[in-house]
Structure formats: structure tokens, C-alpha cells
């Protein structure tokens, strides 16, 4: 049976991306021994999906084929986390594909990689 072990994100500045994603998720650095080319972050306690931040010259896309969904319990937590991540260096994205009454907000990390904060308690009325 396959499991997801590592999700790799392309970034232009590995050190900056490491600081952002460590602050965002509270992950620990497992290794940065790749000469500035890559860093692997692990969840606290070491169990769960890791994130590899790998240097890339490819620009991010406005509609990426793969992105992270970060989950929160309610709308208040969603807004608080969005504000916290913006303070860490993320940007809110004025996305052209929001549905009516979305349960998510779209942000971009300092490299422009888009991700969502999803409200798991969203009332679809």
C-alpha cells in the first residue's frame, strides 16, 4: 500500500521558504544537508507527511495542478490563520475562480506557491 511520505515544493529561496513553512506549520528541520539545494521539514514528533523545499527556477503558476490544503475548524480560526500567515510573508490571492460561499481562502507563500486554508466547519446552508 502506498502512502504519501514527502510533498516537494519548488522554491526560489530555500532558506526563506524554510523559515516561512516552519513558522506556518511548526514543523522541524530534518535535514538541510543538501548545500542549500533542499531542506526537508517534518511534523513535530516526526510522524506524518514531510515537506521538501527544493530550489527551482520554474515560476509558480496562477492555477497550479497541485497545492496544499491546510485545515482549520471554523471561520474565525481560518481568518486568524490567514492573518498570521500574511504576517509571516504570505499574500492573499484575489483568485478568479472562487465559487459562491467558498469554504476556503487562497494564499501564496513568499515564492508564489498557492495554498488554501479550508474551514472544515463551513455551513453550506
Regions found by a protein language model. Give the residues of each.
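Vicinal oxygen chelate
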Residues: 13-14, 68-111
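Active-site beta-strand termini and strand-to-loop segments that position acidic
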Residues: 41-46, 107-110, 120
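Core segments of cupin and vicinal oxygen chelate
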Residues: 2, 8-50
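A short acidic/small-residue loop/turn micro-motif
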Residues: 100, 121-124
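Short, glycine-anchored, charge-dense loop/turn motifs used at functional sites
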Residues: 21, 111-115
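Short, solvent-exposed beta-strand edge segments and adjacent coil->beta transition regions
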Residues: 2-6, 63-67
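Conserved beta-strand in the GNAT
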Residues: 49-54, 106, 115-118
Amino acid at each position: 500500500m502506498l502512502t504519501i511520505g514527502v510533498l516537494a515544493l519548488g522554491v526560489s529561496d530555500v532558506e526563506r521558504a524554510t523559515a516561512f513553512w516552519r513558522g506556518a506549520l511548526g514543523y522541524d528541520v530534518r535535514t538541510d544537508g543538501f548545500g542549500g539545494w533542499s531542506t526537508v521539514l517534518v511534523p513535530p514528533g516526526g510522524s506524518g507527511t514531510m515537506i521538501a523545499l527544493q530550489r527551482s527556477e520554474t515560476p509558480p503558476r496562477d492555477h497550479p495542478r497541485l497545492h496544499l490544503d491546510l485545515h482549520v475548524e471554523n471561520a474565525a480560526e481560518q481568518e486568524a490563520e490567514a492573518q498570521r500567515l500574511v504576517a509571516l510573508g504570505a499574500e492573499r490571492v484575489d483568485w478568479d475562480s472562487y465559487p459562491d460561499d467558498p469554504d476556503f481562502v487562497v494564499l501564496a507563500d513568499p515564492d508564489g506557491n498557492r495554498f488554501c486554508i479550508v474551514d472544515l466547519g463551513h455551513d453550506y446552508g
